[in-house]
Regions:
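Positively charged, small/polar-rich N-terminal and surface patches that mediate targeting and assembly
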Residues: 1-151
Length: 151
């Protein structure tokens, strides 16, 4: 079940103190979800999104976000979530305010082949799993989107 209410900053999805994990298949997400529950995360801490649910949410956010959402990478990350949802990726959003919880979720994400995993903090959104072998980065902006290294 998706988060209700839908947490945003300036109209863009921003689940503060949560880890957002995307999986290429619903099966991988289901296996990760079982492991997350085995790691003592409560049902109230875990939210599931089908590709259609994330696509609908991301399309709404892109259409309704304010220009302030473009100051950081929040809106670019929503666009990336939309892209992944259109490719059929499923998502888990897990409340994880403690560093030990984030470490556990990072290991689970890697074990089950997550495509992305990010920790949403107040001022920083942290990439939790390696995304690309390349070390050449380029600036990110609302016009150019996310650095290809982080895709």
């Amino acid at each position: 079940m998706p988060m209700d209410p839908h947490p945003t900053a300036f109209g863009a999805f921003k689940p503060l103190n949560h880890v957002v994990i995307s999986f290429p298949t619903a099966g991988a997400m289901g296996q990760a979800l079982k492991r997350i529950h085995d790691a003592q995360f409560e049902d109230a801490q875990v939210f599931q999104y089908t590709p259609a649910q994330m696509q609908s949410q991301a399309e709404y956010d892109v259409a309704h976000a304010t220009s302030m959402a473009d100051l950081g990478q929040d809106l670019n990350l929503v666009r990336e979530q939309l892209h992944l949802a259109k490719l059929g990726h499923s998502f888990l959003v897990v409340y994880a305010p403690k560093a030990s919880q984030v470490e556990t979720l990072t290991q689970i994400a890697m074990e089950f082949g997550a495509s992305r995993a990010q920790k949403y903090g107040l001022l920083l959104i942290e990439e939790l799993i390696p995304l690309n072998e390349s070390t050449t980065q380029r600036p990110e902006s609302p016009e150019s989107g996310l650095d290809p290294v982080t895709r």
